[in-house]
Amino acid sequence: MSTHSGDSTKQQHYRSSDPYSGRRPIPTIPKFFRDRKQRAEKKEEQQREQTENEKLFDPITQRDVEINDVHFDYAKTYDDPSFTVPNQSIQGSSLPSEKPYLSSNQPTNVYKQHQDDLAPPEADNQITRDVPISDEKTNILFFPSPSIDLSYVSKEVKQKTGQYSLFAYIFSLVISWFFTHSIIISAVLPLAISSCMYLWMQNIYAVAKDAEWGAEQKRGEYARLNLIPESAEWMNHLLEKVWPLINPEMFSSVADQIEDVMQASIPSFVENVRVASLDQGSHPVRVVSIRSLPSGEASESFSEKQASEAEHKDEPEQQRKQFYNFELCLAYHAKPVEDATSTSARASNLHLRIVFYPGIKGTVGFPLPIWVEIKGFVARIRFRCELMPEVPFLKNVTFSLMGLPELNVSAVPVAEGGVNIFGLPLISKFVNDAISAAANEYVSPKSMTIDLSKTLLGDDIKKEVNALGVIFVHINRAEDLSKQDVNGLSDAYITVGFHKFGKPLYCTRVVKQDLNPIWNEYAFIPVFPDQVKAGEKISIELWDSDRFSPDDVVGRTKIGLHLLIQDSGKMHERCDTLTGISEDTSLPGRVFYEIGYFPRAEFKPSLKTSGHDITIPRSMRDDPAFQNPHGSLDNKEEEAAVTTAPDEEYPSGILSFTVHQAVNLQMNHPTGTFGNVSGNYNTSPAQSVGDVTAEEGSELPSSYVCVDLDDTLVYKTRTKVFTSNPIYNAGSEKFVKDWRNAMLCFTVRDFKLREHDSILGVVNIPLATTLTTSSQLTKWYPIQGGIGFGSVRISILFRSMKLKIPRNLLGWDIGTLEFMDRQIVAEGTGSVSDVSFSSIRVNIAGVKITAKSSTSNSSSTAEYHVRSRHAVIPVNNRYRSAVVFEFRKQLQRKHNVFAMVWLVDLEDNVEQNIRVPIFTSSKPAHVLQNMIDFDHPDKESEFKIIGYLSTRICFHRGLDDSHEQLVDNDDEAAIFETYRCLKSMGLRRGYVKDMKNPLADQRASLDESRETTTASSKFESDDSVDTEDEETTTDRTPIECTQTVSMVDPNVNGDIQGRNSLGTMNSNERNLEQEFISLGYASKNRPKAHAQEGTNQPGASENVEPVLADDSDAVTIHSNISSDDQKRKLVNADDRELEKRLHRGPYNSKIVRTGEWVKDGAKMGWRNLRRKFALNGRQPDVETEISK
């Protein structure tokens, strides 16, 4: 589908397997109003051009068609349908007889013209009439058979055949005997002549019958070509019998979609809304008409994506692809109810039961149940069926509405024990608009495709990512920008996104008061097919950040997406002049950047496996109950996705995740027994435990799911109110820099009023230890660590991109910086007095620590000591942050002596000795904000190097306890609470350590041993190695791990590591676990990081010695505290956090939790107020399926 929201009539196409996401948001009522207004404006414009109807692309017939929103009277259409039919088709017509208007004896052109005259709606009222069929249902031909009647001929021939044959026999017998007097001739000749006469007469009878049936076939062909509808009373009669037998659960997806639309469109005074049920009743929908549509042009109408796929398919497969198109007109009118207070009487019609929760957001709310009855509707739908030779003979079914359906609903409150004496017109209109907004998503040219071959098999698993590739942008710098502020400078930042889409997908940091900013930042933008179809362009916009007014556009530049795709796989260095809204308008300034498009990488055959879970014992792997579901596999790419592990050669790629549904969600309510225990033999009954006994109820959680990727919130689903089995079907696709160290966490939360949303449970998925034998996995995961119970079904899929980025860019954006030896050494180029100060203030994105001067053992250096409790500094935006060392004296507050190192130059979990210049500058703001190269500075950089600073630091990936001081909003608080939850369960040990795919190590050792064996065999005999056997071994060995592998995660505490089903480990497992426990094995063979050519590495020293960080327990802000009292306080703090999360202790009281919510709300409100007056860029929002 197109992501350009400005044109609602643009062709959009969905598949039933596509979940809701930021690219496919839930439709809302305001968006529906905008789309309807745009269609009305376009129709008025066409009418001004003497066009009757709106002409749009029909995805069914692949032609341009004229569509109209339905404005029929649904009651009249349902109760008194009438159709225009030819007079001669009506038996017993009272009209005077006349010459048939349509006859098979007419010439072809006249015959077709008369067919068109009889085809509705251009019918001639002189030769047609409207026939009501409500009183007496009948199957009527809406187009007459040609006026050819051979029944009297057939009857006459059948009667005279015997007489003529007997006459011929007697006549030939007399003649033959009179002339020959031969007994043989007189016996044979009359018999032959009479037989020929009989067969000839029978042939005339058969020809007459063929001509009569040929006329009917000809009528059907012309009726189909002229789009003539046929009566569907047989189908209505069938619906009357089948309709009450349909399971209402079949309409659950429709109810879920209506609920999503209302949830995304509710006003501010309504907190939540829930569709409790949708029932079809016993009164069926009527099929008004059905007609076949032409499909001959289907083979010539491929979309761009289908055309590209067709190039890789066999020609016979393309030739045998067939389509069948038809149009269906439906009408419904509610049956009158005699007793309006009778629930059973009202339930006979199509209805919904909706519960609104009005109130104040997060504070007050109460349920308001509403009974919604569908009074009637009229809809016209077109279907396109793709046929295939295999069972079930239907591949894809595409449907599209030919105009917005006419709909009317009524809503009344559900008053038990009372009489409903008033209706709710506002709610009726809201529900009506919500249903119309949902239907508007399928009005032509939009459409939906359902893969019936997979639906019948229950296949909803995604086995290919939607993204075609990724755009890699290196934003370097800008020069000579225009003056935007009163001081003649500019607070510049850059956003990267798609031009037509408009929404920024990446935003750089703000460089304050500078006309020549240097960012040196990197952006990764996934590219999807609809963006290629829409002719999108990559837009790089430069903005000026203002504190009290909207940001101003400094300029922009664009580059066509198709140009990058044509020259893919490499970076293009560009220097573009800024332009205005029009590309013809030139603005001051230039922007320097590199950009390139990198497509998907193919699956590597050498990584192919059986796809089995290697943690399961080998004897049980072939059991279907222990195999991962993968659905139907339609092509080699889908088969490779479920049997091929991700490629470590291309660690960067697209990660697709989908949250399908959750089951048996339940909350644990810890309460006291409120009883007395007396006597020695007093026993208490067992408590009630087990599965959930109800699917709906006020005691059940209102759940939603937050998705964290590398400790960053990337997705949030909608809230499903008061249900134990919520269906989300929501997901997204995100770019992952390094799948080997990526971690995906799903947090299921319960929406609460007047308190923080509780954690029901979490699911933590490290990709390296999860995607061991395949790139796709769909699995039920139990949630744990929270106040609830249940399971959630999750699908993940990773697809590598042909992109290799420098090692220093593969890390996480969130982590902690640690001073490993607690020492900072300053060395002066001239005299040590130039760098000898009382202290050094270390500043990282607003987090400051102080290093005091200490006694130096050398007269040429000055040493500074970092306290242990200040040795770890939390970092939230690592790739846009720098470590600034400011040299200070006690009596002077401001100094002009600095040193700095950018965190983009560091690798994750690698200790590095850094040596950076100590400088003084007349323009310190320019040097400290811009990423400059001290060896090759720009023209605006003015500094003097007076010494060098040396220290040993390490950037640890992932959250730490010290990040609590950086929490500024609710989303960050939720992420930090999830981290605390994982840590309390033993699934996190401080920072995240390097992870490794266990089969990758086995492959590496196997390849090494195979190379050794092959090399040694060459000295013995050249013919000793059989190529075929070698290939067989190469393909077979990686398929199955010879023993059960223990999936050891270095981030999990050792006491909870997994074991096999027998509780013991063999020698191979023990060796493998020891290899994983040692981080040195995971990274000791990694090559030394080198900077990418052309990138600046400011302050990078030549004698940097990367050393892998120790794998002992992660160093946190509390790791080096020696005081027993302080350690006791920290233990108590952890206990309080556990009680708070599990609602135990004092937090079991609602009043205490509400007080905590008020206190944290005030704190967050103050921080948000301060952030309002800060200079920030247009950062992308957290993705959700609810459009904003």
From Swiss-Prot:
Residues 451-576, 636-781 form the C2 domain. The gene is mug190. It comes from the Eukaryota. Residues 1-11, 84-112 have a biased composition (Polar residues). The modification Phosphoserine is found at residue 1005. Ca(2+) 1 binds at residues 485, 491, 544, 546. Residues 1022-1032 have a biased composition (Acidic residues). Residues 1-61, 83-125, 298-318, 615-639, 1002-1066 are annotated as: Disordered. It comes from Schizosaccharomyces pombe (strain 972 / ATCC 24843). Ca(2+) 2 binds at residues 485, 544, 546, 552. This is Meiotically up-regulated gene 190 protein.
